[in-house]
Design a protein with these regions (language model features):
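Acidic donor-binding loop at a coil-to-helix junction in glycosyltransferase catalytic cores
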Residues: 176-184
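Conserved donor NDP-sugar-binding/catalytic core segment of glycosyltransferases
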Residues: 95-127
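A conserved acidic beta->alpha catalytic loop
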Residues: 35-46, 90-91
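A recurrent flexible, glycine/aromatic-enriched loop bordering the glycosyltransferase active site
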Residues: 140-160
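Short aromatic/hydrophobic "clamp" motif used to bind/position activated sugar donors
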Residues: 83
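Glycine-rich, basic loop-to-helix element that forms the pyrophosphate-binding segment
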Residues: 61-78
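Short, well-formed alpha-helical segments that are part of the catalytic scaffolds
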Residues: 10-25
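Non-catalytic, C-terminal membrane-associated alpha-helical segments of glycosyltransferases
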Residues: 219-222, 237-291
Length: 291
C-alpha cells in the first residue's frame, strides 16, 4: 500500500473531512481515524460511522491518551509506505490535495503541506487565535518555510515515510497539549533528515474562543517547562526566559507579569488584541512557572 492518511481526533466531528478526502483517495491508500477518548457522545457516534466507509478504519481509545501517543498508535496501525498526518480540525481546499503530495515522493522522506486560514475572522470572541494564526501564515511563506525547514515544521499537515517515523516517533512523555511538533522537528534536524515544504495547505477550522485559547497556551507552556533544559534553550520563548533567569531577573519578570496580567488579559480578550502583548503575556507566564 502506498499511503495511509492518519487523523487523530478529540471531540471533533471529522466525518466531512474524511468524505472530502475519500473523493480523491487512490485505490492503494487508506484512511484511519483514531478517537482519543472523546467525551461528547454525539461526536463519538458520528465519527464511528467512518468505519463503514470504503478504505477507512476507525479506532476509539477508552481514555484520553494525549496528542503524542494517539499519533504513534495510528502509525503502528498504518499499512502504507507513506503516512500523512492530518489534524481533525482541517478542511480540504484542493481537489488535488493528495495528488500534490504523492507527486513529490521520489527521493523524499518528509513533506510538509502547510496551514491556511479563513479569509475573515469567524467571530469577535476568536479574534486572538485568528489574528495569531493569520500572522503566522503570512510570516511563513513557502520561501521562508524552505529556508528554515525545521523551525517551520508543523504536525497539522505533513507526510513522512512510515519506516522513518517509526524510528523517531512522537515523545510519549508529552501527554498534555503543546510542543510535540517542536520536538519532532528538532529530532529531524538532529538526524539531518531533509524536510521538503510545499504549497499544499489545509484550512485550520479549529479556532477557539480567546479564554479557551489562553488556557491551551498555558498548558503548552507548562509542557515546555517540563522539558529538558537543553531542549528549552533551542526554543525561542524558553531561551529568552532562561536568559532572564541567568541575569537574575526572574523575580522581577514574575512581579511585572503579576501586576500587568489583568491589563494584558483585558487586551487579549478584546476584539483587537495586540500580538506584541500576547508575546509578553506568554513570556511573563513562562518566567513565572519555570524552575
Amino acid at each position: 500500500m502506498k499511503l495511509s492518511i492518519l487523523i487523530p481526533t478529540y471531540n471533533q466531528d471529522c466525518t466531512q473531512l474524511v468524505h472530502d478526502l475519500l473523493e480523491q483517495l487512490p485505490q492503494d491508500a487508506e484512511i484511519i481515524v483514531a478517537d482519543d477518548g472523546s467525551t461528547a457522545a454525539s461526536i463519538r457516534e458520528n465519527n464511528a460511522s467512518i468505519a463503514k466507509l470504503p478504505q477507512c478504519r476507525y479506532w476509539q481509545a477508552k481514555m484520553n491518551l494525549g496528542r503524542a501517543k494517539i499519533r504513534n498508535l495510528l502509525a503502528e496501525m498504518a499499512q502504507g509506505e507513506w503516512i500523512l498526518f492530518i489534524d481533525s480540525d482541517a478542511q480540504v481546499k484542493s481537489k488535488d490535495f493528495i495528488a500534490n503530495y504523492l507527486k513529490e515522493t521520489d527521493g523524499r522522506q518528509v513533506i510538509c503541506g502547510g496551514t491556511g486560514n479563513y479569509e475573515n475572522c469567524p467571530s469577535p470572541d476568536k479574534a486572538l487565535r485568528y489574528k495569531y494564526e493569520v500572522l503566522a501564515e503570512r510570516k511563513k511563506p513557502l520561501k521562508l518555510r524552505r529556508r528554515k525547514p525545521y523551525a517551520q515544521f508543523s504536525t497539522f499537515n505533513f507526510m513522512i515515510l512510515r519506516d522513518l517515523f517509526m524510528q523517531i516517533r512522537f515523545c510519549n512523555e508529552i501527554c498534555d497539549y503543546g510542543h510535540e511538533d517542536t520536538l519532532f522537528g528538532l529530532a529531524l534536524k538532529d538526524r539531518k533528515i531533509p524536510v521538503l515544504h510545499i504549497d499544499n495547505k489545509l484550512i485550520h477550522t479549529g479556532l477557539e474562543p480567546t479564554p479557551a485559547y489562553l488556557r491551551k497556551i498555558k498548558t503548552s507552556l507548562f509542557t515546555l517547562s517540563r522539558l529538558d533544559k537543553k531542549i528549552q534553550r533551542r526554543i525561542n520563548i524558553s531561551a529568552i526566559a532562561l536568559f532572564i533567569k541567568k541575569c537574575h531577573l526572574k523575580g522581577f519578570a514574575t512581579w511585572l507579569f503579576n501586576i500587568s496580567s489583568p491589563r494584558l488579559k483585558k487586551n487579549l480578550l478584546g476584539s483587537n488584541p495586540s500580538l506584541l502583548l500576547f508575546k509578553l503575556y506568554k513570556l511573563g507566564f513562562f518566567c513565572k512557572i519555570m524552575e
